[in-house]
Each structure stands twice: as C-alpha cells, then as structure tokens.
C-alpha cells in the first residue's frame, strides 16, 4: 500500500505540538534535549513508535489523517515521552512509572498506553480458521506461515489445532 501524503498544514501542526511539548519538558527538567526526527512511515495499527537510539518518532500517516486533532494531542506527546524517558532515566519499562510521570507531570497529557482510533482502514486482511469451538481470524503473516509449514496455531480455549476453512 502506498503511503499517503500528509498536507503541509498537518505536518506543521504535528511539528508545533512536538516543539511545544519538548520546550515544556526542557524547561521543567532544566535540560536541552534535542528535537527528534519525525518520519511518517509507521504502518499497521500502531499510531506511532519511538526509535530510542535514533531519536526518531515514526507516525502512522493513515491514522494521522483520519484522527488529526486526537493524534496530534495524544500520539505525538506519547512518543516524545518515550524518547525523553530513555534519555532521562535510561532503559526502563516502556509504559512504567517513569513514562507515566513524564506524560502527566512534565508534558501535562493523560497517560494512555493505547489509542482508541478506528482501525478499519489500516487493519490487514485476515483468513478464517476453525477449531471445534469457534472461528478464528489469522493475519496474512500467520496464514502464510501455516501454508509454508513453518507454524501451527492452537485455540487457547479448546486446545485444538486451527484448520483453514475452505
């Protein structure tokens, strides 16, 4: 799937949010953390990821376009908090007490681990499989592993091997 183009006005709003939150953090923490690089190449159902060693934030362009205000207000500071926590505390739990403190006390944003965006447009195709108690939907990746003989999957409820439906 081709990555959608983000209009310049939205890119500017994302950058403004990033810079405002970073400036607040630098002021409150009395530090001068460098501005991270923004990349609009996150795919799948993740809204964003923070690449700690690269000081980079990857954002999902599809979810950004569909949820502009909430995305800018929540996802941008969420990923920035991961980078700041790593630089301030070192390696700690991704959504642990340090991250929660950074989100709420430093950035002034509610600490939510996951987004609540509609995912229909980014959810990948699934393949129906069956056990004796229910139907399951396997992702393309898992389905291909089954087809190649690299993996088998069992139902967590009944323990049966999952079999592709015809």
From Swiss-Prot:
- InterPro entries recorded for this chain? SprT-like_domain, SprT_Zn_ribbon, Uncharacterised_SprT
Q: Which cofactor does it need?
A: Zn(2+)
Q: List UniProt keywords, sorted A-Z.
A: Cytoplasm, Metal-binding, Zinc
Entry's transmembrane regions: none
Pfam families listed in its UniProt record:
SprT-like, Zn_ribbon_SprT
Q: Report domain SprT-like positions.
A: 20-164
**PANTHER family listed in its UniProt record:** PROTEIN SPRT
How is this protein named in the record? Protein SprT
Q: Its gene? A: sprT
């Amino acid at each position: 799937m081709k990555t959608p183009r983000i209009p310049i006005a939205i890119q500017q709003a994302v950058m403004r949010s990033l810079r405002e939150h970073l400036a607040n953090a630098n002021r409150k923490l009395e530090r001068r953390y460098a501005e991270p690089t923004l990349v609009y190449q996150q795919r799948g159902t993740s809204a964003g990821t923070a690449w700690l060693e690269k000081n980079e934030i990857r954002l999902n362009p599809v979810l950004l376009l569909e949820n502009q205000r909430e995305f800018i207000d929540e996802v941008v500071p969420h990923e920035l908090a991961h980078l700041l926590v790593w630089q301030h505390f070192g390696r700690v739990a991704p959504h642990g007490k340090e991250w929660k403190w950074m989100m709420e006390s430093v950035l002034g944003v509610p600490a939510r681990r996951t987004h609540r965006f509609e995912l229909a447009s980014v959810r990948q195709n699934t393949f129906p499989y069956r056990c004796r108690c229910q139907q399951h939907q396997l992702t393309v990746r898992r389905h291909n592993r089954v087809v190649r003989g690299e993996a088998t999957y069992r139902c967590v409820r009944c323990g049966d091997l999952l079999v592709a439906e015809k």
